[in-house]
């Protein structure tokens, strides 16, 4: 279906707004993936706080101009599916990585975070806020327990020397 100028401008504005509010973006090629699988991916994306859109490459280039995802322009070739992570920087990358494992036709082209092209594996392995806090607390707890053990050992050594 041919798009008129107003439709194209609306698409560019919509994608631009999504890009401005996003933490990261991932670009993929979904050629060969069945409609049922794409529907599952879209459902999983909604649940993960990821907005996805298939957009013409020329419109996508215009939409990302002036955003931190302008670095992805070189990946806009062939059918392009773009996903913006709104809640966690690694959400879209994790979603696409897992989907690509299950669907060999699905190809992840690239990802961007903080204005730079990033490895999808790197973004997908970023811990969520809750995971990062849990790791920090575990490290702090571990350090406190270690300090207590060293203090008790020093006290024991001091008492043995005195005896």
UniProtKB/Swiss-Prot annotation:
Molecular function in Gene Ontology: large ribosomal subunit rRNA binding; structural constituent of ribosome
Upper classification of the organism: Bacteria, Pseudomonadati, Pseudomonadota, Gammaproteobacteria, Pasteurellales
Keywords linked to the UniProt accession: Ribonucleoprotein, Ribosomal protein, RNA-binding, rRNA-binding
GO biological process, one term: translation
Gene Ontology cellular component terms for the protein in this record: large ribosomal subunit
InterPro entries recorded: Ribosomal_uL10, Ribosomal_uL10-like_sf, Ribosomal_uL10_bac, Ribosomal_uL10_bac_type, Ribosomal_uL10_CS_bac
Family: Belongs to the universal ribosomal protein uL10 family.
Pfam families: Ribosomal_L10 (PF00466)
Role noted for this protein: Forms part of the ribosomal stalk, playing a central role in the interaction of the ribosome with GTP-bound translation factors.
Name assigned to this protein: Large ribosomal subunit protein uL10
Signal sequence coordinates: none
Alphabetized SUPFAM superfamilies for the sequence: Ribosomal protein L10-like
Subunit structure: Part of the ribosomal stalk of the 50S ribosomal subunit. The N-terminus interacts with L11 and the large rRNA to form the base of the stalk. The C-terminus forms an elongated spine to which L12 dimers bind in a sequential fashion forming a multimeric L10(L12)X complex.
